A protein has these predicted regions:
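N-terminal accessory targeting/assembly segments
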Residues: 1-118
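Short coil/loop residues immediately preceding or within conserved phosphate-binding loops
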Residues: 12, 185, 208
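A generic structural signal for alpha->beta connector loops
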Residues: 72, 132, 161-163, 210
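Phosphate-binding glycine-rich loops and their immediate beta-loop-alpha structural context
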Residues: 99-104, 108-160
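Canonical P-loop GTPase G-domain recognition
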Residues: 134, 141-196
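Walker A/P-loop
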Residues: 194, 199-200, 204
Length: 227
């Protein structure tokens, strides 16, 4: 579209939600030559009157936006999702909230220590399947586990057909098996309790420190919320 001298000229485009901060959204505008990062807000009349809470944009959503030459962006519509995670709204009477969308795989991250819990794994598997994506169980801290095969066998019996990767994000052992899920155009979300090594795992995947990490207690292998 050819621009004129009118600074308020509007252009419509498709964008990806990369972060949500209350009423402000960080978006990546898809263009032919390069992508542009912008801040955006919702078109109030559309989202607060015509749509329920489930339709509010979340990380991973593709949305239709309207921009002007000043760099202002307005989110007009949330495009159909291929997968989505929901959480219950803490406000009584309000609809559940979408927290992540359009991912291909759900990495169910569990550590091979005292924190491993089969009931929790069942809940994770159910959530992953209900999201519409494919679950992959990531067993972390292989370098600290004397019998990783024990945990792998437990998962394989509990979730037949689900891929299992036993890894050490510290030594890199087993990380090559994870790479097959990270091809071009693929998106992954991580699900796991505190202290299982999600931040360390992400840093290992990225090859650099992109997330802070925290220590766990030795007596029960519990961790602090870092990711």
């Amino acid at each position: 579209m050819e621009h004129t001298g009118n600074k308020t000229e509007n252009t419509k485009a498709t964008a990806l939600i990369t972060a949500v901060h209350r009423e402000r959204y960080e978006i990546l505008v898809e263009q032919e030559t390069s992508d542009t990062k912008l801040n955006a807000r919702l078109k109030t009349g559309v989202y607060y009157q015509d749509k329920g809470g489930e339709a509010f944009p979340t990380v991973g959503d593709r949305v239709r936006i309207q921009t002007n030459r000043c760099g202002d962006a307005l989110i007009l519509e949330t495009l159909p999702r291929t997968s989505v995670f929901y959480r219950e709204n803490p406000t009584p009477g309000m609809e559940r909230q979408a927290v992540a969308a359009n991912f291909d795989y759900v990495f169910l991250v569990m550590s091979m220590n005292h924190d491993f819990n089969q009931n929790r794994l069942d809940r994770y598997l159910t959530a992953a399947w209900e999201s519409g994506a494919t679950p992959v169980v990531i067993l972390t801290k292989k370098d600290l586990c004397e019998e990783p095969e024990y945990y792998v066998n437990l998962v394989e019996r509990q979730a037949p057909g689900v891929a299992v990767c036993a890894v050490s994000a510290v030594t890199g052992e087993g990380m090559e098996h994870v790479q097959r899920y990270l091809g071009a155009g693929k998106t992954v979300v991580l699900l796991g309790s505190s202290g299982v090594g999600k931040s360390t795992f992400v840093n290992a995947l990225c090859g650099e420190t992109v997330m802070d990490t925290g220590a766990i207690r030795e007596d029960d292998s519990k961790g602090r919320h870092t990711t």
